[in-house]
Amino acid sequence: MTNTQQQSESIDDNQAQLSKQQNSDNNKKVPRVLMILDGFGHREDDKDNAIAAADMPNLDKIYEQYPHGLISASGEDVGLPDGQFGNSEVGHMNLGAGRVLYQDSTRISSEVASRDFYKNEALVNAVKAANTLGGNVHIMGLLSDGGVHSNQDHIEAMCHSALVHGAKNVFVHCFLDGRDTPPKSADKYINRLRDHIIKLNAHYESGRVQIASIIGRYYAMDRDNRWDRVQKAYELITEGKADRLSTRADGAVQAAYKARETDEFINPTVVIGRDEVPYTVDDNDALIFMNFRADRARELAQAFVLPDHEFSGFARNKQPKLAAFVMLTKYSDVLADNPKTSIAYYPTSLTNTLGEYLQSKGKTQLRIAETEKYAHVTFFFSGGREDEYKGETRILVPSPDVATYDLQPEMSAPEVTDKLVEAIESGQYDVLVVNYANGDMVGHTGIFDAAVQAVEALDVCVGRVAAAVHAAGGDMLITADHGNCEQMQDYESGQVHTQHTTEHVPLIYVGEKKVQVRSGGKLSDVAPTILALMDIEAPKEMTGENLLVAAE
C-alpha cells in the first residue's frame, strides 16, 4: 500500500468517525432543566438574610444576564389558607400539577368547621373498634399551628370526636415542633391543648382526655431512615420508655428547656397521671395519626403496622395488636395496602401532571435529589404517585449522615450536581427536575453562618449546571418551592427564625430565547412554562399560564 493510499484511508476513517459523532450529537435531546432551590425566597431587607449575605458570583452573573422575576409560593396561590406560608410538599405538588391544588389541610379544616369531620367513617370506626374491645384511643401528631405537617385544630377536634363517640380514655402523644414554629414555643401549644382538654373533660363525664407523652419531632418525624431516632418515639409510645417523667406536660417542657433542649429536640418524656404509670399503646387500642403530610409520618407508621418480614428499622420489643390504626391521609401505597390500616382522607386524583403529560408525549424525564427532598421531586411532584412514568429515571443521592445540617451546610449538593451535569451531557433527557435541599434544611437549623455557607455551596452548583445547559443548547428555569433562609431571625419572638416564610420566590430563565418574566405568577405556572419551552401545548387540566412572554 502506498503512502498516498494510507493517507486517503486515514482521512476516510476520520471523516467516518466525525460523521458518526455528528449523528450521535444530532440524536441528543435538548435539555430543559427545572432547578428547585428549596427554601430560597426573595426578601428585600438584607438584615438576617443568608442569601443577601452570601458570596454568589454565579447567581449574580445569572441575574445580570438573564430574565428574572418573582412568583408567589404561599397562601391561596398554592391552595393554602390566606397568609399561610408554603412548604415543600405543597410547593412541589403545585409545581408539578400546573394548577392550584387545594391542600388536604384546607379540606380537613373545612370539615372540622362544618362538623363533617365528626362523621368521618375511618375515624369514627376506629373509636368504636376500641370501645368494642375495651381498649383506649390514642392520638399522636405534631402539636403546632405551623400548618406544614399538621394543624392543632385537627388534633383538638379528634379529642372531641373520640368522646362524642363514646371513648372512655383518650391519650394524646404530642410531637413538638420548633422547626415550622419558633424553637421554644411549645408551651403555647401545650397550654392551649390543656385548656381544651379541661373543657372536654368537664363536659363529658363518661370519658376523659389526657396528654400521655411529649417528644421532639427530630425523633418522631424522621424521613431519612434514621431508625435510631424513630425507635425512641416508638418505645416512648408503646413502652413508656423515656428520659424524663413528669406529672404535667408544661412542666416537662420547662424541664427540657433547662436541659438546653429546644422543641424539635426534646427527649422522650412520659406524662404520668394520678396512678403514676405511663399511658402506653396496648392490645385492643386504636391509634390515630393526625399528621396530614405523608413524608415525615411514614417511618413511625411503618413501625406500628408492618410485620417483621417487611420491617427492618429496629427490633420492636412490643408490637400491640391494635383495634385500628388510622392515617389522617394516605402516607404511602405500602401503608395503604396494609390490612391493619385505614385512611381518613383519601387523595383527590390528578390527571395530566407534568410527568404524566410528558409520558403521553413520548418524552423522557429525570428526577434527581438527595434523600431529604427525594420524595418531593418524585412522589409529590407527580401528584402523589409512587411509581415512575414510562421514560422517567430517578436518581437518589444519599444525604450526609450528620445530626444536623449546619455541620455540613453543602449537604450532598456537589454529588447531586455531578450526576445532574452528567445527565445533561448524556443527551438522554427532555426534562430534568432537580431539587437542592440546602436553603431549607440548613435554614431550619436557625444558624446564620451555616445558612450563608449553604447558599455559597449552592452558587457553585448553579454555575456548573448553567454551564452544562448552555453547552447543550438547552433552557433552564430556576425557582424555589417556598422561602426560608432569606430570614434567619424572628423579630416577634426574639428567637432565631427556623420556619418557612411567605415571601415570593425567584423565577429565572436561563437560555437564549428573547423573553421576559411576566408579573403575577405563581408556582402552578411553572409546568406550563416548561411545556411552552418545548413548544408543547399544555393540557386543559393545567390552568397555570406561561410565565415567559416576548421581550419588549
UniProtKB/Swiss-Prot annotation:
What's the EC number here? 5.4.2.12
Q: In which pathway does it act?
A: Carbohydrate degradation; glycolysis; pyruvate from D-glyceraldehyde 3-phosphate: step 3/5
Q: Which cofactor does it need?
A: Mn(2+)
Task: Locate the residues binding substrate.
Answer: 149, 179-180, 217, 223, 293-296, 373
Q: Which organism is it from?
A: Psychrobacter arcticus (strain DSM 17307 / VKM B-2377 / 273-4)
User: Which major enzyme category is it?
Assistant: isomerase
Subunit structure, as described in the record: Monomer.
- Locations of Polar residues compositional bias? 1-25
The protein's name in its UniProt record: 2,3-bisphosphoglycerate-independent phosphoglycerate mutase
Recorded GO cellular component terms are:
cytosol
Binding positions for Mn(2+) 1?
440, 444, 500
Q: Which gene encodes it?
A: gpmI
Q: Which Pfam families match?
A: iPGM_N, Metalloenzyme
- What GO molecular function annotation could you give as one example from this UniProt entry? phosphoglycerate mutase activity
Its biological function? Catalyzes the interconversion of 2-phosphoglycerate and 3-phosphoglycerate.
